Amino acid sequence: MIDRVLLELNKTEGIKGSMVVGKDGLVIASQLPGSVDAELVGAMASAAFGAAERTAAEIGMGTLEQTMIEGEHGKTLMVDAGEGILVVLTDAKVNLGLIRITMKRAADKIKAMF
């Protein structure tokens, strides 16, 4: 069922792939391009999201809603999805507003599955 949510999410313009990873770094579901090592990306995304959560708490920002890694060739966005983290890989030039709204809806569906 999570795979269906990811497949639908991947239809959004600019999204190259998506996955749900546990807070422990283990892949729960993945719809990433074949050239991407899902287990490696999942472990790194979980670590990055965890560090961002701790940073947000330490500086008094409250609960972390989203974190983004932006590079020359694309972006990686991560949002809390209950027992997991929704990770989305995008092109460099994307409509971030659309991506964020679409991710929020997908994360809500995923939360309901846990």
From Swiss-Prot:
Disulfide bonds: none annotated. It comes from the Archaea. GO terms for biological process: cellular response to amino acid stimulus; positive regulation of TOR signaling. GO terms for molecular function: guanyl-nucleotide exchange factor activity; molecular adaptor activity. Pfam families: Robl_LC7. SMART domains: Robl_LC7. This is Uncharacterized protein MJ0310. It comes from Methanocaldococcus jannaschii (strain ATCC 43067 / DSM 2661 / JAL-1 / JCM 10045 / NBRC 100440).
